[in-house]
Amino acid sequence: FFQSMSAMTTVGFNTVDYGAFVLPMLLVTIFLMYVGASPSGTAGGMKITTLTAVIAIMKSRLRNHTRITFFGRAIPYERLYVATSSFIFYTSIIALGTFALSFIENFRFEDLLFEVASALGTVGLSTGITGDLGSLGKLIIIVLMFIGRLGVLTFGLALWAKQQQTDEKKALRDDIAV
């Protein structure tokens, strides 16, 4: 229980050797770092409410409902857009960061994924490979920590906010097949 709270709340208090964890336990810890904690706190991660909103979207879609509800409450579409964007962007950054590290570093994939999830979630836990990463690997971890502390949506807005304003003025309404 203590280790799961440490992973979710970015305490970074490491009392066990995560490098010695078996794969299922490592994956559970990675998931907890990925999700994070409540949006009202300072913990990193994607946030529990974002994951909950995405699950509500999937549940409503599978039941062919047009309104997205959770525990009998309708979730505003604007919040759903933010949650979906955050989920996709956060997952993409973890995937890209892990891919980049696996391309330049010679460690087990799950250890690299753990380091990336910890860095982006600003958790502070490690499987023990951080010190053995090369200069470029450490730079990737530093960039991920910066993005995680800044927030993935804030980072995304910094990259694409100006472009979005001009695109919205030019965009025509259309429908696509999904």
Language-model regions: role of each:
Residues 1-178:
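Membrane-proximal intracellular helices of multi-pass ion channels
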